[in-house]
Amino acid sequence: MSHAGAIAAIGVALIAAALFSAIHKIEEGHVGVYYRGGALLTSTSGPGFHLMLPFITSFKSVQSTMQTDEVKNVPCGTSGGVMIYFDRIEVVNYLIPSAVYDIVKNYTADYDKTLIFNKIHHELNQFCSVHNLQEVYIELFDQIDENLKLALQKDLNSMAPGLVIQAVRVTKPNIPEAIRRNYELMESEKTKLLIAAQKQKVVEKEAETERKKAIIEAEKVAQVAEIKYGQKVMEKETEKKISEIEDSAFVAREKAKADAEYYTSQKTADANRLKLTPEYLQLVKYQAIAANSKIYFGQDIPNMFMDSSAGPSVQSATLLQDDSPALNEPAVGDE
């Protein structure tokens, strides 16, 4: 009985071991590939639990999401013969799930060693071999990342379609200590030069600001002077216009006054011309004679009252006053 129990226990253990080896789990972001007898099977599996034939089938989980591969301590010889070392180069990449089978078949599940690590060494040495230390360490260092990315992706597009390089990050290389000190001194001098140049620019900027300020002040003074001059000109023009208006008004008044006097004189003359008729003049003459207390003697005295036309030709008689002695003498025929 004990022998049969032992056999049963062994059988249960074998079945449990078979089930344990048959059930496996694939994590999210991974693709499972299977090997049977060392041969890669065409079937792949996604995330979750899966079954496989125990003992004769094995699997590997291949990451298909974004991952970062680090390539460390990469030697690089420049065109000048200086050996430098890049401490760390990071390659960010991801694998398209549909391309997992082909890439694993051609480059195994550790495809990154062949397609990324070795390729980084090759491309970086190619870059260093055609550039000197100054270019690699300073002038072209900012281009190394992009150049490596483009070179890797170009080769992968033909060798392993489906493997995508997202980014490449390269650290500053280590150079010999003596050269590094020289570069530090050079950078220090360059920094001093830049500081001096910046100070010079600041001084020039301040001078330019002062010059512009002076120009603005001068323009301001000129504009104020121009405005004042314009005001004076306008005042003079206003005074001139006022004077012209006053002169015009005075001329108009004088002309109106002269016209009025002329009109009055003309009307007076017309009235006199109409008034001084021969009859009126005769009446005035009679009135003057009647009002005159003087006595005129002469042969033409009667004619004064008989012939008005002889008025201008009448000879003047001897004028005697009322109190003259001749008036008191008797006439010759009175005796």
Curated annotation (Swiss-Prot):
Residues 1-2 are cytoplasmic. It comes from the Eukaryota. InterPro entries: Band_7, Band_7/SPFH_dom_sf, Erlin1/2. GO terms for cellular component: endoplasmic reticulum membrane. The keyword Aminoacyl-tRNA synthetase does not apply. Coiled coil: none annotated. Residues 310-335 are annotated as: Disordered. Residues 310-321 have a biased composition (Polar residues). Residues 24-335 are lumenal. It is found in: Endoplasmic reticulum membrane. GO terms for biological process: cholesterol metabolic process. Glycans are attached at N106. Its main location: endoplasmic reticulum. The chain crosses the membrane at residues 3-23. GO terms for molecular function: ubiquitin protein ligase binding. It is a single-pass type II membrane protein. Disulfide bonds: none annotated. Keywords: Cholesterol metabolism, Endoplasmic reticulum, Glycoprotein, Lipid metabolism, Membrane, Signal-anchor, Steroid metabolism, Sterol metabolism, Transmembrane, Transmembrane helix. The keyword RNA-binding does not apply. Belongs to the band 7/mec-2 family. Mediates the endoplasmic reticulum-associated degradation (ERAD) of inositol 1,4,5-trisphosphate receptors (IP3Rs). Promotes sterol-accelerated ERAD of HMGCR. Involved in regulation of cellular cholesterol homeostasis by regulation the SREBP signaling pathway. This is Erlin-2. It comes from Xenopus tropicalis (Western clawed frog). The gene is erlin2.
